[in-house]
């Protein structure tokens, strides 16, 4: 901010400007406190909680978006992802540090979450195949077919509850028909 030449202003005008600036600063400070409090509350519900390293604002929002996406896909497909599939979903667009924390939390190797480098093409003669760390595009969370006619996901990760929480499903025939239709229509797309 440029210094203002105050020699042309009356003392009353200078005083009014200072008061307005102090009020504006107070409003901005209150707005930032509200935003920070909301982000702290959000951090309690995402997989990397405050028990771990505190995430930046943007990492918190990205992880929350990915977590919502993962939960939504679990509900749509009615399947529980493998830890690696779940980690891929959560790590989408996150920094390497956050990705490493997720890998540790979900007990997968961090290198399995790395996108394939452009040099993999030259070192791997089967470069036309998918990189082993990435699931095939348009695959569902789980490639295994249901063992029974009523097989909703058994558990999902809840950061506020250390143990997994059971998901509910229905074994009524209408539910089974709807489940089987949706499990073949809804697929999970991964973005490398």
Swiss-Prot record:
Subcellular localization, as worded in the UniProt entry: Nucleus
InterPro entries given in the database record: bHLH_dom, bHLH_transcription_factors, HLH_DNA-bd_sf, NeuroD_DUF
First-listed, main subcellular location of the protein, grouped into a coarse class: nucleus
SUPFAM superfamilies referenced in this protein's UniProt entry, alphabetically: HLH, helix-loop-helix DNA-binding domain (SSF47459)
Any one GO biological process: axon development
UniProt tissue specificity: Expressed in neuroblasts of the AB lineage. More specifically in precursors of the embryonic ventral cord motor neurons. Expressed to a lesser degree in the EMS lineage which generates mostly endoderm and mesoderm tissues.
Annotated Gene Ontology cellular component terms: nucleus
Span list, region Disordered: 116-192
Phenotype upon gene inactivation: Defects in axonal morphology and synaptic connectivity of the ventral cord motor neurons.
Composition bias type Low complexity, residue spans: 139-163
SMART domains: HLH (SM00353)
Single GO molecular function: E-box binding
Pfam families the record matches: HLH (PF00010), Neuro_bHLH (PF12533)
All copies of domain bHLH, residue ranges: 19-71
Keywords: Activator, Developmental protein, Differentiation, DNA-binding, Neurogenesis, Nucleus, Transcription, Transcription regulation
Function: Acts as a transcriptional regulator whose activity is required for several aspects of motor neuron fate specification, including cell division patterns, proper spatiotemporal expression of fate-specific markers, and normal axonal morphology and pathfinding. Involved in regulating glial specification.
PANTHER family with a match to the protein in the record: BASIC HELIX-LOOP-HELIX PROTEIN NEUROGENIN-RELATED, NEUROGENIC DIFFERENTIATION FACTOR 1
This protein's name: Neurogenic differentiation factor 1
Organism encoding this protein: Caenorhabditis elegans
Gene: cnd-1
């Amino acid at each position: 901010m440029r210094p203002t030449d105050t020699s042309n202003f009356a003392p009353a005008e200078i005083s009014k400007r200072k008061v307005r600036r102090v009020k504006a600063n107070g409003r901005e400070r209150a707005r930032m406190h509200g935003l920070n409090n909301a982000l702290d509350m959000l951090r309690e519900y995402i997989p990397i909680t405050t028990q771990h390293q505190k995430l930046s604002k943007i990492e918190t929002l990205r992880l929350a978006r990915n977590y919502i996406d993962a939960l939504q896909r679990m509900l749509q497909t009615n399947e529980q992802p493998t830890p690696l599939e779940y980690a891929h979903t959560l790590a989408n667009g996150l920094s390497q540090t956050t990705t490493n924390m997720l890998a540790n939390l979900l007990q997968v190797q961090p290198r399995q979450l790395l996108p394939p480098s452009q040099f993999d093409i030259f070192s791997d003669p089967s470069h036309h195949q998918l990189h082993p760390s990435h699931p095939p595009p348009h695959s569902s969370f789980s490639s295994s077919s249901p063992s029974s006619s009523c097989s909703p996901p058994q558990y999902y990760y809840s950061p506020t509850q250390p143990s997994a929480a059971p998901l509910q499903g229905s074994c009524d025939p209408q539910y089974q028909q709807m489940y089987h239709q949706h499990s073949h229509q809804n697929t999970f797309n991964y973005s490398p």
